[in-house]
């Protein structure tokens, strides 16, 4: 009995030990699986929620940005259609846009010219004031009368005929937008007797534009370039005119003629010619650089005769900006014409700017008043100091023409 009970006790003890080991292993495996399951549910789920929220926010931002881009594109399309519509609505719209672009270009040129003036010094003499530069009023034209130290009598003849004196000239600037000045530089000895004589004349009449330029017959090309650069910096005008002091001019007729070309951005107006290139030394108008114009006997390109010509604002701006690289030929009218070669410039050949002193009278009687009159044989009015009044009497437009003119 005791042996059987003892044997059963051992079996039960062994069985309990076996069962407890099984359960222990099972429970360990179970807890391990439960731990994995618990971890999967507790941690990845919030992370996926964060990613999901970020994705949603990102998608929302992309959607809004896309809508903004679409609206911008639609706005641009509408704006483009509006602009094109405006262009097609008016036949003058393209010309107006071209003039606006030209105005912006000249404003840029103004800024460049001002900067160069500050960096390199003013192009005019130190004793000359520039009140117009501050106001920048708009003018129709600036008429520069080219003169020399020895031409006092010529200047007086011009003052007595077609250039209004003193207060009348100032009134002309204010009411008609026409500026008129005698243009002269300084002598090779600044402050000498010649300069003092001009200064005294300026104090009396106040009608000079003094240039930072040394006077000399062979320096006319440089003087012309300096004149346009200086006038462009001082006065905001539609046109800049150069005329010699031995030429008769009808100012009202000139203004009316130039006003016809106001919508032309780049226009060069004068009596166009093409004379022979003179290679022989010692003759008048000898061309030292004749070889640049081809074989002997060739002619110059078309250019305005030097007695009187006019250029538009854009061309004056071009000269001002490029003054340091523009080549100077010995003849100033040839130089000016060469500066416009290669540019999109309209050349206007107007024969009313170069009437003869014998023709201008009957033309005036017929109602076809000349803009300018002179004698071709003298490249100006022969003995102009003595004959200017007579030419003015016969060929002038009348004393009231300028007052009644509207441009």
Swiss-Prot record:
Family recorded in the similarity comment: Belongs to the glycosyltransferase 31 family.
One of the record's GO molecular function terms: hexosyltransferase activity
Pathway: Protein modification; protein glycosylation
GO annotation, cellular component aspect: Golgi membrane
Protein name: Probable beta-1,3-galactosyltransferase 4
PANTHER family found in the cross-reference section: BETA-1,3-GALACTOSYLTRANSFERASE 4-RELATED, BETA-1,3-N-ACETYLGLUCOSAMINYLTRANSFERASE
Organism whose genome encodes this protein: Arabidopsis thaliana
Cofactor: Mn(2+)
Enzyme Commission number(s) of this protein: 2.4.1.-
Signal sequence coordinates: none
Keywords per UniProt: Glycosyltransferase, Golgi apparatus, Manganese, Membrane, Signal-anchor, Transferase, Transmembrane, Transmembrane helix
Location, primary (coarse class): Golgi
């Amino acid at each position: 009995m005791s042996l059987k009970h003892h044997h059963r006790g051992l079996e039960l003890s062994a069985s309990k030990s076996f069962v407890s080991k099984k359960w222990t292993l099972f429970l360990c495996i179970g807890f391990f699986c439960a731990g994995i399951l618990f971890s999967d549910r507790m941690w990845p789920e919030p992370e996926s929620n964060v990613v999901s929220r970020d994705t949603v926010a990102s998608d929302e931002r992309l959607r809004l940005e896309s809508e903004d881009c679409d609206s911008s594109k639609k706005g641009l399309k509408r704006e483009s259609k509006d602009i094109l519509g405006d262009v097609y609505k008016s036949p003058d719209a393209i010309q107006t846009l071209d003039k606006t672009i030209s105005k912006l270009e000249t404003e840029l040129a103004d800024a460049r010219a001002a900067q160069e003036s500050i960096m390199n010094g003013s192009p005019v003499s130190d004793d000359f004031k520039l009140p117009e530069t501050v106001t920048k009023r708009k003018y129709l034209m600036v008429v520069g009368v080219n003169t020399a130290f020895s031409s006092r009598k010529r200047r007086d003849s011009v003052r007595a005929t077609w250039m209004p004196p003193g207060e009348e000239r100032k009134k002309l600037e204010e009411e008609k937008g026409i500026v008129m000045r005698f243009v002269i530089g300084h002598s090779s000895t600044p402050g000498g007797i010649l300069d003092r004589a001009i200064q005294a004349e300026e104090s009396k009449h106040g009608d000079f534009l003094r240039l930072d330029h040394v006077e000399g017959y062979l320096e006319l090309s440089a003087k012309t370039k300096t004149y346009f650069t200086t006038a462009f910096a001082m006065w905001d005008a539609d046109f800049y005119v150069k005329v010699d002091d031995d030429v008769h001019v009808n100012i009202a007729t000139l203004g009316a003629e130039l006003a016809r070309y106001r919508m032309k951005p780049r226009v060069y107006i004068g009596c166009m010619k093409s004379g022979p290139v003179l290679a022989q030394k010692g003759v008048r108008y000898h061309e030292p650089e004749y070889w640049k114009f081809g074989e002997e006997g060739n002619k110059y390109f078309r250019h305005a005769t030097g007695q009187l010509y006019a250029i538009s604002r854009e061309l004056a701006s071009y000269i001002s900006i490029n003054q340091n690289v523009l080549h100077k030929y010995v003849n100033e009218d040839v130089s000016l014409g060469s500066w416009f070669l290669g540019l999109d410039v309209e050349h206007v050949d107007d024969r009313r700017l170069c009437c003869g002193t014998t023709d201008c009278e009957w033309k005036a009687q017929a109602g076809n008043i000349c803009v300018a009159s002179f004698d071709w044989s003298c490249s100006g009015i022969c003995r102009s100091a003595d004959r200017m009044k007579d030419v003015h009497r016969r060929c002038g437009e009348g004393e009231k023409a300028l007052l009644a003119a509207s441009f």
